[in-house]
From Swiss-Prot:
Signal peptide (UniProt feature, chain positions): 1-24
S-diacylglycerol cysteine-type lipidated residues: C25
Assembly notes: The basal body constitutes a major portion of the flagellar organelle and consists of four rings (L,P,S, and M) mounted on a central rod.
GO cellular component, one term: cell outer membrane
Pfam families from the UniProt entry: FlgH
PROSITE patterns named in the record: PROKAR_LIPOPROTEIN (PS51257)
Localization (cell): Cell outer membrane; Bacterial flagellum basal body
Chain's gene name: flgH
Record-given protein name: Flagellar L-ring protein
PANTHER family reported for this sequence: FLAGELLAR L-RING PROTEIN (PTHR34933:SF1)
Amino acid sequence: MNRISVPRFSVLIASLCGITLLSGCVAPTAKPNDPYYAPVLPRTPMSAAANNGAIYQAGFEQNLYGDRKAFRIGDIITITLSERMAASKAATSAMTKDSTNSIGLTSLFGSGLTTNNPIGGNDLSLNAGYNGARTTKGDGKAAQSNSLTGSVTVTVADVLPNGILAVRGEKWMTLNTGDELVRIAGLVRADDIATDNTVSSTRIADARITYSGTGAFADTSQPGWFDRFFLSPLFPF
């Protein structure tokens, strides 16, 4: 018996390709010290021309009859997280197809096609017929619910020309089993900020909220690489 030999180099290449495909199924892990979420310090105002006898400095005015709210780059705002999302969907499909056909030939060029059966019984003929039926049914349901509550204090990263505040920041918490983080970025109207410098996360436009973590607890909630292979779209069955 001839044996087919496979080069070891081909086996190595195939293994590397499989590992690469499986690594793409792994969710990226958040890392600390991301420059995008770093605290933004207040900008140093440009020195204005000296105004003899004046104590007013442009850019640092305050309303004597209003509340002090964040409105400059580097100011601090506390965001109250009150996110609740629920989604559900269902789909049902059914398809049925029936077909029946028959073919009967009794003569060809004027000659009969029916012949005597040498075994006995009925005469032989070229008549044919078939029946076909096909049925396909499908049913699918999905439901998901998420909730996130808490608070994160962020800084004003930029002030748009229309007065909208671009805020972003993060909170890292080191626990016994690893690290937990909450990141948030978005746009806030100054009118939505409460008197205590807090704003609800539901009032943030273009919000980017991330809740993730690292450590033993995060690892146990992730399936292994072998399980991810069978759950990936690349699995042929």
